[in-house]
Amino acid sequence: MVNRQFILIFLFVTISFTFFAYKPIDVIIAGPQMTNLDKFELELKNIEDSTGIKIKYETYSDIETYLIENNNSDVDIAIIPNPQGVTNLGEREIILSMDQIVSKETMDSYYSKHLQEITTSNISDKNYGAFFRLFPNSLIWYSVEKYKEIGSPKFKSYNELLEFTSNYSKENKDLWCLDIESGASTGWIATNWLEDIILNNYGVEIYDQWSNQEILSSEKPILNSINNIGKLVFTENAVYGSHKRIVRKEFRNNYKNLLNEEVSCVFSWGGHYATLYMPEDKQYKTDYDFFKFPSPLNSIVGIGDVLTVLNYDEDTKLVFNKLINESFGENWMSHIDSSYIPANIKNINYIANPITSDERDLIVKSLSDNSFRYDASELMERKIGADALWVALENYIDIGRERAYREIEDITEELDSNF
């Protein structure tokens, strides 16, 4: 009898404690799997501790599709990997406009004009997102040792880079590792090259017209920019394995070969993603480094993700404003392996990771004069930016100098037929 009473009392106390101690989730955030997820979740824990709001982060391989197919989900805040997805969800009335969550004054003080424009719907004229993170594309990576061996040249423009390449290139001394093969997505790296050339040679106005599909690829600025890719990849003895290798070998090989003493290449043209594929036994600044795509301008092409709101209440509004605040991520950025670069231009917390810090410096300069531009291929209609443009550039590189220069008008006209 005593044992039975003890068990009943024990169960009552346990259940009561569990009931009163349990706090339901107040705000659910959903988004992609990300590097440094553990550090992001620690930042969410800091918000929990300061506000008393319980937060949960859920990962999805395709958050945009999930939200479309689950229109009545419990998700309160979503991180969308590209601005096109943001406007798509906004026009479907799945996410809310920013004017319900953040003041116009705050948005203007935190974000460049361009970052606000590309999350604004052309249909409703409403902005549906606030950028969270940014990553640069416009980088030239190099082997520190090999770079010293060729005299540590400095370049003020792409033309200077081409001239040096032409003068230096000789048999068995290929200067560039430029593999771009990426399965069904082969061509996306070449679109990054094209974007760098257009932005830095023709400026933000032409770049914006092209990304908005207001000018055709057959028009001179774009056609000439494609041929400027050819001036690099078709230079004799300039590219490891020649132009034929470029579209046939996986892009991850670039960074292994770049730091291989038995491979001659000094440079590789890529973005932030290169850091994911550098050999683990090699160190930044000691073994490899980068410089911005050469230009007298601060212009940078990059990518990033966007914070959006689905369900409005005071808890969600408070958490959202904490996420975009200039103080967010202070602990995250203090870690030596942090890859977090805030899109908020006022967030200038110390970044311990030297690569991330150097990348952030370039991004801040470009944001300050509104010359940061989002990856154009991701702003275009998907049948163009994620298909026809990839195919066109892959074919252009593969067919070689004579045919490419002869058939460039046919290639661009075929591309324009998708507009």
Each language-model region and where it sits:
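Conserved N-terminal structural module of periplasmic/extracytoplasmic solute-binding proteins
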Residues: 1-87, 403-406, 413-419
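Short helix-initiation/N-cap motifs at beta->coil->alpha
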Residues: 58-67, 242-256
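Hinge/lid segment of periplasmic solute-binding proteins
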Residues: 82-138
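Short, solvent-exposed loop/beta-turn-alpha elements that line the ligand-binding surface or hinge
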Residues: 99-110, 184, 200-224, 278-281, ...
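Extracytoplasmic/periplasmic substrate-recognition and gating elements
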Residues: 126, 278-343
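Extracytoplasmic/periplasmic solute-binding protein
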Residues: 128-132, 162-214
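Glycine-centered hinge/linker elements that transmit conformational signals in sensory
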Residues: 208-247
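Conserved C-terminal helix/tail region of periplasmic/extracytoplasmic solute-binding proteins
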Residues: 353-419
